[in-house]
Regions:
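Short hydrophobic/aromatic beta-strand immediately N-terminal to the Walker A/P-loop
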Residues: 50-53
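N-terminal pre-Walker A segment at the start of P-loop NTPase domains
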Residues: 15-34
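Phosphate-binding/switch loop-helix module in NTP-utilizing enzymes
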Residues: 115-175
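Loop/turn-to-beta-strand initiation segments
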Residues: 77, 109, 142-145, 176-184
Length: 256
């Protein structure tokens, strides 16, 4: 059986998050950036299974980090399962985008679980075991939001049916009130399976890179959001700026 260390990258001390926030909670998942939230149906309903799909370097992780920042502002606990980030690199990235979450991390409102599997034997049985461990942790965790960044690596060593079963279990957990965000590369599944994956999820955000003028920009398409306050189908063009994070590019400028 595979061994996966689900010990978080911080001590998880207890305190009232409202003491850090200084304001009342808001029961919707937002990025903490009003300009971006307007484009994603005024925020994503809590209790949703959210798919963030895109190729390499399209801003999937950056978007989840904005969600983490918004979650802290809205009195929500977050568990982040990352296949790439260490505690140090996570905090450094957040700081580089002026998303200061160090106090929340120190108090345990954000917990980072490292999925760096050193000297790990990649087998379908082992990967299925890891997926089961993750889903059980999410089910019994006191976190309001779970982020899996990314699911792609697991799809390479296990069957697509096993991943679909994982997503179905995740959807059942969301029906009980938890919110789960999953990032995934578009190439991870066949077209038929990808259609099934998208249908399971309550929200589907598609991240792309587009050449506009003489430069590439990132584009977020809101494909669907069940229970959204506003209609979906919006396209958001943005760049990632050091010291600022996601910066919306007006359509008129993006087309120049």
């Amino acid at each position: 059986m595979a061994e996966l260390d689900l010990s978080a990258g911080n001590e998880g001390q207890s305190a009232d998050i409202s003491e850090l926030l200084g304001k009342e909670e808001k029961r919707i998942l937002t990025t903490g950036n009003a300009e971006i939230d307007k484009k994603i149906a005024d925020g994503l309903p809590l209790g949703s299974l959210i798919l963030i799909e895109g190729e390499n370097d399209t801003g999937k992780s950056v978007f989840t980090q904005q969600i983490i920042s918004g979650s802290m502002r809205n009195n929500l606990r977050v568990d982040l399962f990352s296949t790439e980030l260490t505690t140090k690199s996570f905090l450094t990235q957040m700081e580089s985008m002026s998303l200061d979450i160090s106090d929340f991390f120190a108090w345990g409102y954000i917990r980072l679980f490292h999925c760096h599997l050193v000297e790990f034997k990649w087998t379908p049985e082992a990967m299925n075991d890891i997926l089961e461990r993750i889903i059980m942790h999410v089910k019994f965790s006191n976190a309001d939001v779970a982020i899996i960044d990314s699911l792609t690596i697991f799809t390479e060593y296990t069957s697509q049916e096993a991943v679909l079963s994982f997503l179905t279990q995740a959807k059942n957990i969301c029906d009980q009130g938890k919110t789960i965000l999953i990032t995934m590369h578009s190439y991870a599944f066949s077209d038929e399976t990808l259609t099934r994956v998208r249908s399971i999820c309550d929200a589907h955000l598609l991240m792309m890179r587009k050449l506009m003028g003489d430069k590439y920009v990132m584009v977020l398409e809101v494909v669907k959001v069940r229970g959204a306050r506003k209609t979906t189908g919006n396209l958001v063009s943005f760049e990632v700026h050091p010291g600022y994070g996601m910066k919306i590019i007006p359509v008129s400028l993006a087309k120049v």
